[in-house]
């Protein structure tokens, strides 16, 4: 009982409870001492110590991230600006550079615009000084400097975005295209940190052999995670930086391609929600352009397993331009891939989305421009069956886009060379358009294409016309017979309905002969 009473009494705080670090090394606190900087330490507190330190002494700055509580940093002491690089001797600039970098490992809370205004401005000006220094430095960056630059990037940039699953099931019922993208409130600092990282990677004073210790696989993966940011400004910086990393760090190239591949797989087959697919494809377009010939099997598999299936998601319009560029690059590199690409397009051809169908037709034209005759012949039958369906589309833009294929000289030459196969496939669709399409522009374009076909081979054209008229007559006869059959069935059923007798219907022959008297079953 006495122990319980004493247990409720407040204890005198021990000296260790005010420290940021755990003497046993548990709870993890990383402290960096900055000599003569006006900052006693920059600390990353554990979850246990952060609460007890939140009401610290005068001058303490607690700066949680706007997006993640894991990035809360603390400054014990006064956050003061360091001397300018102009005010110190050249020999002291490298040390001052590292001190300024360490000073920028503090993350402030930008969700509250009125909080820590002075400290935020000091940090922003310090970051700008660092960017200028890296742009003008004439000596190789030291190992310590590169480590601190990487640390600034990790502390300021890397964070987890909310809603990892993107609530995809809920978003399916919403028109997410009309939503305004969320802008990062900490952008005044993030932008300069990105600029610092970009200058660091692009600088000739950065030794890639040393820098790869810090710009490692883990760093690259976290950088790729940031491509899901809703802020397009951030994605533009990420695109440029990742491209620079790919160019400078050759050892990371296969890993970067594989990591992007995995992002695509997850997007295609799991989430169908990612904000940075267009930017990643833009990087890949440049990478594919630099592929050596002949193409490696790994690169061909990437086309088949990742790029072609990217046509499947509903939101493909958000990145289709970049995707189309990548696809065409592959066909231009290896024309034998044209058949694979065209059959892939046909596999994912939209059925109910007309605007997406127009995009597919545009991409198809670009692919066909790079297609040689041999590959064209392998896929022309299924291809022009789909084009014939597009010609008869009630959506006038789809029909128009399909007819525009005949305006392309290369495609028209391919069609002319294989007109004996293609004309019988598309002729019925053309003829139906001229007779009954509701849109006058489609009718006019169809007549022009019809004229081209007649000039190509008048004999085959006449045969196709005769075949179409014969099929049309047969179809009319079939419809008439079907209507007659139903009419006779109704009359037979009406005559038996008074006596409530079951109506026995004989098996009808192809001539649809009905027994009006006694049947074989009566």
Swiss-Prot record:
It is found in: Cytoplasm, Cytosol; Nucleus. Residues 35-58 have a biased composition (Low complexity). Disruption phenotype: Wrinkled leaves, stunted growth, delayed flowering and formation of age-dependent yellowing lesions. Conditional phenotype with premature yellowing and constitutive reactive oxygen species (ROS) production in distinct peripheral areas of mature leaves when grown under moderate light intensity and low humidity. May partially evade the accumulation of H(2)O(2) via alternative oxidases (AOX) activity. Increased levels of AOX1A and AOX1D in leaf mitochondria. Increased level of ACO3 phosphorylation. One of its GO terms (biological process) is S-adenosylmethionine cycle. GO terms for molecular function: poly(U) RNA binding; protein phosphatase regulator activity. Gene3D superfamilies: Leucine-rich Repeat Variant (1.25.10.10). Induction: By heat shock. It comes from the Eukaryota. Pfam families: B56. Residues 63-74 have a biased composition (Polar residues). Residues 1-74 are annotated as: Disordered. Expressed ubiquitously at low levels. Expressed in roots, emerging lateral roots, cotyledons, leaves, floral stalks and flowers. One of its GO terms (cellular component) is protein phosphatase type 2A complex. Keywords: Brassinosteroid signaling pathway, Cytoplasm, Flowering, Nucleus, Plant defense, Stress response. Belongs to the phosphatase 2A regulatory subunit B56 family. PANTHER family: SERINE/THREONINE PROTEIN PHOSPHATASE 2A PP2A REGULATORY SUBUNIT B (PTHR10257), SERINE_THREONINE PROTEIN PHOSPHATASE 2A 59 KDA REGULATORY SUBUNIT B' GAMMA ISOFORM (PTHR10257:SF115). PP2A consists of a common heteromeric enzyme, composed of a catalytic subunit (subunits C), a constant regulatory subunit (subunit A), and a variety of regulatory subunits such as subunits B (the R2/B/PR55/B55, R3/B''/PR72/PR130/PR59 and R5/B'/B56 families). Interacts with BRI1. Interacts with IGMT1 and IGMT4. Interacts with ACO3 in the cytosol. The B regulatory subunit may modulate substrate selectivity and catalytic activity, and may also direct the localization of the catalytic enzyme to a particular subcellular compartment. Required for the formation of the PP2A holoenzyme that negatively regulates brassinosteroid signaling by dephosphorylating and inactivating BRI1 in the cytoplasm. Seems to be functionally connected with CPR5 and may mediate the negative regulation of defense reactions and senescence under low irradiances. May contribute to the epigenetic regulation of defense gene expression. This is Serine/threonine protein phosphatase 2A 59 kDa regulatory subunit B' gamma isoform. The lineage of its organism: Eukaryota, Viridiplantae, Streptophyta, Embryophyta, Tracheophyta. The gene is B'GAMMA.
